[in-house]
Regions:
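Catalytic strand-loop segment that frames the active site of acyl-thioester-processing enzymes
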Residues: 7-37
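Conserved small/polar residues in nucleotide/adenosyl-binding loops
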Residues: 1-5
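Hydrophobic beta-strand-centered segment that forms part of the acyl-chain substrate-binding groove
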Residues: 53-87, 92
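Hydrophobic residues in beta-strands and at strand termini
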Residues: 24-26, 77, 124
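A generic structural signal for short beta-strands and their flanking turns/coil linkers
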Residues: 8, 18-20, 69-73, 84, ...
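HotDog/MaoC-like acyl-thioester-processing domains
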Residues: 80-83, 87-89, 93-131
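Compact, glycine-rich, soluble single-domain proteins
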Residues: 34-55, 70
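Feature marks short, surface-exposed loop/turn motifs that line or immediately flank catalytic pockets
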Residues: 30, 52, 124-126
Length: 131
């Protein structure tokens, strides 16, 4: 997890179907319109869940991890985000040599009642050599 993830409180809460299950605890800084979770916070959670799913799929040592850069991101907002904890989990559809395709879902009360979903294509770049 990176600094941005910690700033909005995202952490790994466990696994779901073998993929990391992320939680974004509710905080006042995540409020958009009164009584609603900000769509940008939800989209950020979806992106981080996609990266976590890919990272868990790749067989890399911790010090040699790849860098993931979004190529295309499509987010569907299905329900209003309530002022409560939000969960997300990604499913890696395909990982190629340079591109990964991931489907991600975010929910609050039940995984069967998604508040948002995303399809993402991310470029996989090797970590730059330090020198």
């Amino acid at each position: 997890m990176c600094i941005r993830d910690r700033e909005i409180g995202i952490s790994i809460a466990g696994t779901r179907d073998g993929a990391p299950l992320l939680v974004m605890p509710y905080s006042e800084g995540l409020v958009g319109a009164p009584g609603r979770l900000h769509g940008g916070a939800i989209a950020g959670l979806l992106e981080i869940a996609a990266i976590a799913a890919i990272d868990a799929t790749l067989d890399e040592p911790a010090d040699g991890r790849s860098i993931f850069k979004p190529i295309t991101v499509t987010v569907d907002f299905m329900r209003m985000g309530k002022l409560t904890d939000t969960f997300a989990c990604g499913e890696v559809v395909r990982v190629g040599g340079r591109i990964a395709n991931v489907a991600v879902t975010a929910w609050q009360e039940s995984p069967d009642r998604a508040i948002a979903a995303a399809r993402m294509n991310l470029a996989i770049s090797p970590k730059p050599a330090q020198g």
